[in-house]
Regions:
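Short amphipathic helix-loop junctions that connect adjacent transmembrane helices
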Residues: 11-30
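Helix-loop junctions at membrane interfaces in 12-TM secondary transporters
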Residues: 73-84
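A late C-terminal transmembrane helix in Major Facilitator Superfamily
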Residues: 111-142
Length: 177
């Protein structure tokens, strides 16, 4: 879910930044900050998972993704774009690395290759759908870049709730002995 939500928002970001009155250089700077925020945490995400547990890191990622949406919905100033996209990158990192860790730990070694392939099909199918949906939401949601940007960010909410619910279920279900 974190990968698809990141793609949903990131795809529309340059259009939204320029549509809200900033130049292409500003859009490039926002996306650059976002990409750095996606990958720099990788130096310590594994250590955080080892220390706090994978479920807590995934939950933190979901909360950070929700925070990204909240910041984006709070205004269309350049600072909002920067903060929202930096949070989006960090949330993606925690969610994606955490979920990948969960997947690896949920299967026997002989099952992992097949499960990774199925997971990649689902993940990148979701990313494709999110990317296509992003343009539709951005351009068909009221006629203004501000309305489109709001629609893109509001679209994250149901998926964050579903992912959060699934994570709660995984955390509370009885563990195999």
């Amino acid at each position: 879910v974190s990968y698809a939500l990141m793609k949903l928002v990131m795809t529309s970001t340059p259009l939204a930044v320029v549509g809200c009155g900033f130049d292409a250089g500003n859009a490039a700077d926002v996306v650059t900050a976002h990409v750095l925020a996606m990958y720099i945490p990788s130096f310590f995400t594994g250590h955080l998972i080892a220390r706090f547990g994978v479920e807590k890191i995934v939950a933190t990622g979901l909360v950070i993704l929700a925070g990204a949406g909240a910041v984006a919905l709070n205004g269309v100033h350049l600072e909002n774009f920067f903060v929202a996209l930096i949070l989006l990158g960090i949330g993606w990192n925690f969610g994606f690395i955490g979920a990948t860790t969960m997947l690896a730990g949920a299967h026997a070694p002989h099952e992992r290759g097949r499960m990774q392939g199925l997971n990649d099909l689902i993940v990148f199918g979701g990313v494709t759908f999110a990317s296509l949906s992003s343009g539709g939401l951005m351009n068909c949601s009221g006629g203004t870049p501000q309305a489109g940007w709001a629609s893109v960010n509001l679209a994250m909410a149901p998926f964050l709730m579903l992912a959060g619910g699934a994570l709660i279920w995984l955390t509370l279900r009885p563990k195999d002995a």
